[in-house]
């Protein structure tokens, strides 16, 4: 039996949303009706994220960064989405992402 959840009118902030579990969670929240802020240290269109170490560099080189693509998929579901670069170790960046142009976050999915 599937559990139905209506998150219409809610804003979710998902960190680590460029791939894997964070990306899957962001899409699931959007399917449940939430607008989503996708916060990740990497965006496809942005150079320079390699400074965050070898994992970031490998992910970019292998085309495994999907933050902006995920935002487009969420918009395709009829929800609002915003992809932002955010270092979750920097409190000011997280607070800025949580109070984005979509409004204050109602849901936080730390990944």
What label would you give each PLM region?
Residues 1-104:
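Short-chain dehydrogenase/reductase
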């Amino acid at each position: 039996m599937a559990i139905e959840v209506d998150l219409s009118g809610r804003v979710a902030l998902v960190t680590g949303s460029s791939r894997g579990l964070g990306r899957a969670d962001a899409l699931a929240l959007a399917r449940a009706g939430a607008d989503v802020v996708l916060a990740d240290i990497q965006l496809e269109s942005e150079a320079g994220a390699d400074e965050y170490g070898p994992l970031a560099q490998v992910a970019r080189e292998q085309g495994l960064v999907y933050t902006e693509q995920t935002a487009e998929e969420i918009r395709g579901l009829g929800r609002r989405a915003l992809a932002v670069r955010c270092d979750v170790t920097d409190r000011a960046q997280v607070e800025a992402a949580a109070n984005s142009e979509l409004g204050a976050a109602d849901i936080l999915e730390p990944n």
